[in-house]
């Protein structure tokens, strides 16, 4: 993380004011007192800047990527190379600057939905059209999965990713064995252990070929509320959405995004549990309808695909994440939900 003074000195050295003025189409200057660090990790840091223009002061976001690690490279490339395809679904990018083995991206500040309102299931209908729009832009586009983007965009069907899933599932099986002996987890895991461990050992890493058969596109990969932004969440029609934090983006079956957006939130929101079936049915219908509007139809029933995507993602990633969090004393409250749903839907889907 940069101290405010050091960061501002770097702006002066790199002539950032001049470059932003060119991008914004009018004279602009970063206010040295208006620099706030919002978040800093070993991979990146995010700063909010106040930029003075003739027409008034505007907030901007600066994201500093500290290395070219794979996840950073994916997000940097989404912001730099995918703008022509994903325009309108990303924040406006004003400047990309390379500095001392770091990449600095100056972008539009758009407020996260979380914090603008108390989220209610009805609000999904204002977000899902943008998810469908995102997927429709590159749906089954082989120029994306086989073309020049393949050098930086992970492809779910690739041998590299398949090997990664195999490795991850093996780790999940090991954690499940450990969970059966751990006082914190054994009562949660025991009723489902035989079924889930059998699936992990015998059936993976790809449990449902239908997911790939029903279409892939650029997916965000981490559609939680803090990664979904809009300037105005007060309207009663589809919101103008911009997605941020693209480090998990890949060319993958589209239904994974829907299960993260909807089912993971249902798992967290205990107050929604009585209406869970109605909520997911409503969301799946909205998504299928929005994709149909854009000319795309799913051969397999949409609700089946939704459940398949959830089970696949949970077996390859979700269970591992929750078990790891429990063993690291960092939570893991979704473990009972995941174990129960994987068992129930796994049987229902014939696994």
Set out the residue ranges of the language-model regions.
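Juxta-kinase regulatory segment immediately upstream of eukaryotic protein kinase catalytic domains
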Residues: 1-32
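Conserved beta-strand elements flanking the ATP-binding pocket of the protein kinase catalytic core
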Residues: 50, 91-97
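A conserved alpha-helical element in kinase catalytic cores
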Residues: 63-93, 122-127
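Conserved structural core of kinase catalytic domains
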Residues: 95-127
